Amino acid sequence: ENGKKHSQYLRDGELEPLREQIEQRKVLQAQLKELQAKMPKVRQPKLDFETSVIVGKGLAAMSQGVKGWGLRDCFGQLEDYLYSNESDRVCLVFGLRRTGKTTMLRQAIARMSKEDLSRTAYIKARRSDTMAMMNRDLKKLFDAGFRYVFIDEVTLMRDFIDSAALFSDVFAAMGMKIILSGTDSLGFWLAMDQELYDRAKPIHTTFIPYREYSRLLGIDSIDEYIRYGGTLRAGELAFDDEDVNAQDASFRDDESTRRYIDTAICKNIQHSLACYEAGGHFRHLYSLYEAGELTSAI
């Protein structure tokens, strides 16, 4: 002890009782070990969620597919937020379709330690979800010890823009790390201007420089970069198969280009305006929106 050796001598007649006590202790330890092995394992009670929540083994399986994929240049900002000490703020990952948003979330989950992964949940928001449902599920997750929550396509919820402060002012303030992702950039900007003012760390994924595109996909052709509009969908395909690539390219012809613009840009703008303060910001565009002609006008 403390670098010193201590010795103790036994008196005559004390050795045998001590040996008996040692043997008795060994027997009791063996019995304790046997009883502990027979005890049923305590399982965490199954949580009943209203939204689409993935935890545990499902979460680990979901992140397996992205291991070994290249990281976006902005990925470091996401991990900086996850492991920082700041509270009261959420992280927003937004941008056009096929720019790596969901992949970034899966990569962040895949790189977590086992301890952090056990406290992580992934939620895929749906149009039928509401902020009230999300609030109840987040309370259950917090009470169960979860501290990292990734919510994908959060802007699909119609009341997100007008109620987004729930994430920052309540759950982030309680110590949870909330990552919100979606394609509706206007919806996020409206939320940051009101509900999430000075309460959000934005990460914009839309712009992908050619150098980053080439690094991620291993392609040195500027023609391919232009062909896919600087998006990353090609990274999920086999470039040796020209037919598959031609069919899937977002900008392979006028029709595919128009469809991408209509769904990824025009309809997102309309969705944001419709959800923000009960559609009160359409103004003179409302007649076009009601007539279904606003997409063409945009």
Where on the chain are the PLM-derived regions?
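Interdomain motor-coupling "hinge/lid" segment immediately C-terminal to the ATP-binding subdomain
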Residues: 188-298
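Hydrophobic positions on the alpha1 helix immediately C-terminal to the Walker A/P-loop
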Residues: 104, 108
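Hydrophobic anchor at the beta1->P-loop junction of P-loop NTPases
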Residues: 93
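Short glycine-rich substrate-engagement loop in P-loop NTPases that contacts/grips substrate
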Residues: 117-145
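Conserved lysine of the Walker
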Residues: 101
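A short, basic N-terminal segment
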Residues: 37, 43-87
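Conserved P-loop NTPase "ATPase switch" module shared by AAA+ and STAND
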Residues: 142-164
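Sensor-1/coupling segment of RecA-like P-loop NTPase cores
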Residues: 170-192
